[in-house]
Curated annotation (Swiss-Prot):
MF-aspect GO terms: GTP binding; GTPase activity; guanosine tetraphosphate binding; translation elongation factor activity
Main location: cytoplasm
Name under which the protein is recorded: Elongation factor G
Source organism of the structure: Xanthomonas euvesicatoria pv. vesicatoria (strain 85-10) (Xanthomonas campestris pv. vesicatoria)
PANTHER family: RIBOSOME-RELEASING FACTOR 2, MITOCHONDRIAL, TRANSLATION ELONGATION FACTOR G-RELATED
The gene coding this protein: fusA
Length: 705
């Protein structure tokens, strides 16, 4: 089957935003204008097409990135048809993993901002993630119809807070109740969308007299930004004082693709104004898969390799999301970087070293699906029937193996015990949690060896709430959950602490004998970055002259590594410790791997106790947006929670307070902040670092442990 849309006319982009910037409504309008959705789904009614998990519709926040394919021929239907693969991403900090996952497979992004709230704390987190993957992006200032909407202020914030070279492509006509449309700075015409047709038709008019000067100045800024793309354009601009529409677009496109500028559009998705022109911007300014550098990976011999975005290159794809679907079972969403794949083909997963057969291939439109026979470079689709694939795995041709860069997922910071309400649900709960962990690598499940309890860990309270909720809805497992527990860590402060332990049991017959002398020290920052460090622990063998035979050294390391998973203070993992094996002895007959493993373990426990052991607690970077009236209460509360204030910023909705607060003090914070501010303050938090817990906290944790 031949390719229906040339790859140059593909746009794989994500819609990213802070909560409440109107991202889901914007996505809905895109689906409506591209003809996929016949009725506009409003988030207010819990009917949005993109938010297709029940909890998302209830909570009105987007959790899962749903991938949708749509087509666009321009606002005035004059362009050749372009194929959009749109990925909707969540804006809540507990789900940054979802954002990271989608950014990895996108070519570009549309950043939706609220014209009233502007650049919110969370926008900065998402922006940083987009910088990490060098994703070209444009901005859409939404909610221009809301009281307090201010386009210029948001453009300034893009520059000041995000360091973006923001280039407005439009100027709004009016704001708040008086928002009527936009001035297109390329054509220097006013665009008015027809309300009766829900914005599907529009007309160009002359620019209102009071906006001519503003528009002329904004256009000069835009043309100048375009001219800086190349010497030729700059020469023409300096000589003639202007550039043609085509030259402006090609200059802006070139600079957007290099992530040098961020073109800015505006509108009100809710009022059906502006999204249409923004979609034209996606075509003109965001990259096709062919505009992005070839994807990088490593081949079978661990050498660097690349794949170009062509149908003739060997097949390579990245599985970026696993979902459990009530009708077809497990769905693997994947992005094809190169080559083609037909349903029924075999693919190779180099991460798991396994071959898999691709059963059916589905083209997803939110949660409706259409079966297709093949996918080609640039496509995003979902495969049915892949058994052993985890988020972040590569799928490739068996004869041309490549492993694409793995995604890095953060360690969970919060845990809670969970048990089924009825014994008969135990097995069902195990299966449900297994499925959910396969979908979401930032969610972990383990069994506590001592208590036999099932412990679930994740990125925040909301994250775990939603997991428990999904167990109930999707797997019919009712569960009781324990109180959230903090993921503490243990380490030492003293250097070069010697510990000598001899494990000797000789009671007739073959005995056991292992003797080790080790030195414990905290790792330096440089050492922690070294590639020999695994699980934040460094083992150095300093034995010479066969004092301990070579074959027993791995057992010593194994004994140490098994011990650090549960530290001596309160059973939390040990981090940042370097252990040097400096001396020991052995017995020709009685020494064994087991004896050395035990000796190493005991030497470590004794040495750790002498090396000024300390408990570390996770510190969260918290950003609170509060109206000024409640500032005193909010800041007093931050101090009571052992928070350290990092500074304040102004925000349209009051003040932004930045603070570092221990996670242990943040449980239930959402509820107490709501009552403190009568529901008007909001906050977001993400893990920042570990630091030593004060003695009273360490004592309380140790007693509990």
């Amino acid at each position: 089957m031949a390719r229906t849309t040339p790859i140059e006319r593909y746009r794989n982009f994500g819609i990213m935003a802070h909560i409440d910037a109107g991202k889901t409504t914007t996505s809905e309008r895109i689906l409506f204008y591209t003809g996929v959705s016949h009725k506009i789904g409003e988030v207010h009614d819990g009917a949005a097409v993109m938010d297709w998990m029940e909890q998302e519709q209830e909570r009105g926040i987007t959790i899962t990135s749903a991938a949708t394919t749509a087509f666009w021929s321009g606002m005035d239907k004059s362009m050749p048809q372009h194929r959009f693969n749109i990925i909707d991403t969540p804006g809540h900090v507990d789900f940054t993993i979802e954002v990271e996952r989608s950014l990895r497979v996108l070519d570009g992004a549309v950043f939706v901002l609220c014209a009233v709230g502007g650049v919110q704390p969370q926008s900065e987190t998402v922006w940083r993630q987009a910088n990490k993957y060098s994703v070209p992006r444009m901005a859409f200032v939404n909610k221009m119809d809301r009281t307090g909407a201010n386009f210029d202020k948001v453009v300034e914030q893009l520059k000041a807070r995000l360091g973006a070279y923001a280039v407005p492509m439009q100027v709004p006509i009016g704001a708040e109740d008086g928002f009527e449309g936009v001035v297109d700075l390329l054509k220097m015409k006013a665009i008015h969308w027809d309300t009766a047709s829900q914005g599907t038709t529009f007309e160009y008019r002359d620019i209102p007299a009071d906006l001519v000067d503003v528009a002329t100045e904004a256009r000069s800024f835009m043309v100048e930004a375009a001219a800086e793309a190349s010497e030729d354009l700059m020469d023409k601009y300096l000589n003639e004082g202007d550039l043609s529409e085509q030259e402006i677009l090609s200059g802006l496109r070139e600079r957007t693709l290099k992530v040098e500028i961020v073109p800015v559009f505006c509108g009100s998705a809710f009022k059906n104004k502006g999204v249409q022109a923004m979609l034209d911007g996606v075509v003109h300014l965001l990259p096709s898969p062919a505009d992005r550098p070839p994807v990088q990976g490593i081949d079978e011999d661990e050498k660097e390799d690349t794949r170009a975005a062509t149908d003739t290159a060997p097949f390579s794809a990245l599985a970026f999301k696993i979902m459990t679907d009530p009708f077809v079972g497990s769905l693997t969403f994947f992005r094809v970087y190169s080559g083609t794949l037909n349903s029924g083909d075999q693919v190779y997963n180099p991460v798991k070293s396994k071959k898999e057969r691709v059963g059916r291939i589905l083209q997803m439109h939110s949660n409706n699906r259409e079966e297709i026979k093949e996918v080609r470079a640039g496509d995003i689709a979902a495969a049915v029937g892949l058994k052993d694939v985890t988020t972040g795995d590569t799928l490739c041709a068996q004869d041309k193996i490549i492993t694409l860069e793995r995604m890095v997922f953060p360690e969970p910071v919060i845990s809670m015990a969970v048990e089924p309400k009825t014994k008969s649900d135990q097995e069902k709960m195990g299966m449900a949690l297994g499925r959910l962990a396969q979908e979401d690598p930032s969610f972990r499940v383990k069994t506590d060896e001592e208590s036999g309890q099932t412990i679930i860990s994740g990125m925040g309270e909301l994250h775990l709430d939603i997991i428990v909720d999904r167990m109930r809805r999707e797997f019919n497992v009712e569960a009781n959950v324990g109180k959230p527990q903090v993921a503490y860590r243990e380490t030492i402060r003293k250097s070069d602490v010697k510990s000598d332990y001899k494990h000797a049991k000789q009671s007739g017959g073959k005995g056991q004998y292992g003797h080790v002398v080790i030195e414990l020290s905290p790792m330096t920052e440089e050492e922690r970055k070294s590639e020999n460090v695994k699980d934040d622990f460094l083992f150095i063998n300093d034995i010479t002259g066969g004092i301990i035979p070579k074959e027993f050294i791995p057992s010593v390391e194994k004994g140490l590594r098994e011990t650090i998973t549960s530290g001596p203070i309160a059973g939390f993992p040990v981090v940042g410790v370097k252990v040097k094996l400096v001396f020991g002895s052995y017995h020709d007959v009685d020494s064994s791997e087991m004896a050395f493993k035990l000796a190493a373990s005991m030497a470590f426990k004794q040495g750790f106790a002498k090396a000024s052991p300390v408990l570390l607690e996770p510190i969260m970077k918290v950003e609170i947006v509060s109206p000024e009236d409640y500032l005193g209460d909010v800041m007093g509360d931050v101090s009571r929670r052992r928070g350290v204030l990092q500074g304040q910023d102004d925000s349209p909705s009051g003040k932004i307070i930045n603070a570092m607060i221990p996670l242990g003090e943040m449980f239930g914070y959402a509820t107490s902040l709501r009552s403190m501010s009568q529901g008007r303050a909001t906050f977001s938090m993400e893990f920042d670092h570990y630091e030593e817990a004060p003695a009273n906290i360490a004592d309380a944790v140790t007693k509990k442990g």
